[in-house]
Amino acid sequence: MFSETDGSRKAIGDVDVLFHAGLYHLFHLVLPNHDFIAHAVSTDALNWRRVNNALFIGDPGNWDDLMLWTMHVSPDPHHNGRWRMFYTGLSRRDHGKYQRLGLATSDDLFHWKKSPVHWEDHRGPQDPEPVKEALRRSRSTQADSRHAMFDADSCFPLEPDPKHYEASLDEGRRWVSFRDPFFYHDGTDGFLLAAGRVKVGPIVRRGCVALMKETSPGHFESQPALHHPHLYDDIEVPNVINVDGDHYLIGSIREDAKIRYWYTGKLGDPWASYHDNVLLAQGNYAGRVSRDDKGWLLWNFFSMNLSDRTAENLITPPKRLVRTDSGLLRAVTFEGIDAHLRQTVDTRCIHSLIEDVGPQVEICQADEGDLELTCQSGFQAFVFDEKLDHFRFQAKLETQGVGKCGMVFRLDPVTRDGYYLSLDLLKGVAQLRAWGTGADGSGEHMMQFASLQAGFWFSEDHGSAEVQLIAFGSYIEFSINGRVVLSLADQRFDAGNLGVYLEAAKVRLSNVHLQRLASPRQTDDHLVSG
């Protein structure tokens, strides 16, 4: 995981990852300045090393001289061994209110050169001649990661076509959406997707996936929207993938900060939505897909502060994308975490957390890896003896009766501060809370309680589920029947007891496995601090 350092007043923004020759290449925005696109590499998708930045804002007067926004890197279908980066740029001329798309190319993924543009610098027509001469002399004479050469025949920077999309600052929100490019090639034709907005309808319901077709190398023609759900303000960071012949459109929704998807049999047909179309729970945003030698991966940043997504952002481990027999997409645990598994913890060593309870029935039986737990009244937790920081817990959990159950982890046995994971196996609801104690004498504020994330699932087998809980550094992941339901980062608690809690309930745990994980080799701020 990595984040920007607090002292730098920077945070990670949208990400894009490409796997090539055994290396994962991570490109990401840097917030709030948006003045360059950073680049890092990894062999395991978990530990990263920063390399030279890939791209920079243009010099004053260029179309991208204010900010750089989301990018997408893919192989150039017209030139073997070359890579293309489509990216979003904002200009000072428009005060950052108009988004356009540009292109840069590279032969090695490390050294990038901006492609020619038709944009001209019209500043200062009344400037004194010495000032005009100084401006001419200061301009670069060749393309690089900052400067693009002029070509009147270039189609870049791309702008929204007013025939299909909002394209004027006089329309809609007075703020033109045309960002987050994604290049998709179906084997015959190439298409460029972008977050755009149709021209009609309620203003905050115009968000669509804009579409352009590559008619010749580096030249694109506008098409009608690939998908307009008639519901959202924007569909950010769109992606299209082909899985077993079906197409899936993945986008991030600003309204609830979730990653959703739609599906269709072939491009051009209407897009449909499943009853459950959320890939990752709230807080996971700007989802990007990439393919490695094992299949599709879903990447995103997690925002620990939903009220300000320009700060406290972390990149969590990727999720493997799989397709169910019924066609739904599911995010599952990235198998690379297995390399960090260490000692097995004896799950027969378990005890009740609260000793000073009144007369009631409490049962804790351990038999060959199975556990029978009962609490007749009130709250009780049964925790494993060993203190744990990083771990993976797996079990089949079965509830009996109508009581409540859940899990606790990184729990202080004295104050009982830690993480509380509420589980409703009948309705399919998981809710993670951080519950702690404030400063002495802080009155009503001494109780510290935060709802961190909620996730939902459907299962035919009510009251029973295969569960997996991973705590790896500040990363927390919870899966039900192999599907990731919760995925987040939180830094409140770092070690303590792990166990199962009951409220007037009886549960059975079978196939219980608990293993320590090696501590992450890198801190959350490793990449941004060097």
Predicted regions and their residues:
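A short hydrophobic beta-strand element
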Residues: 85, 298-300, 428-430
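Short, well-structured alpha-helical interface segments that form or flank functional binding sites
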Residues: 235, 284, 390
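Beta-rich carbohydrate-recognition and catalytic domains
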Residues: 1-232, 236, 242-281, 294, ...
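Hydrophobic membrane-spanning alpha-helices of multi-pass integral membrane proteins
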Residues: 286-299
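Generic recognition of flexible, low-complexity loop/linker segments
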Residues: 14-15, 199-200, 237-238, 286-287, ...
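Short, solvent-exposed coil/turn segments at beta-strand boundaries
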Residues: 21-23, 293-295, 366-369, 427
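Extracellular glycan-recognition regions
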Residues: 312-530
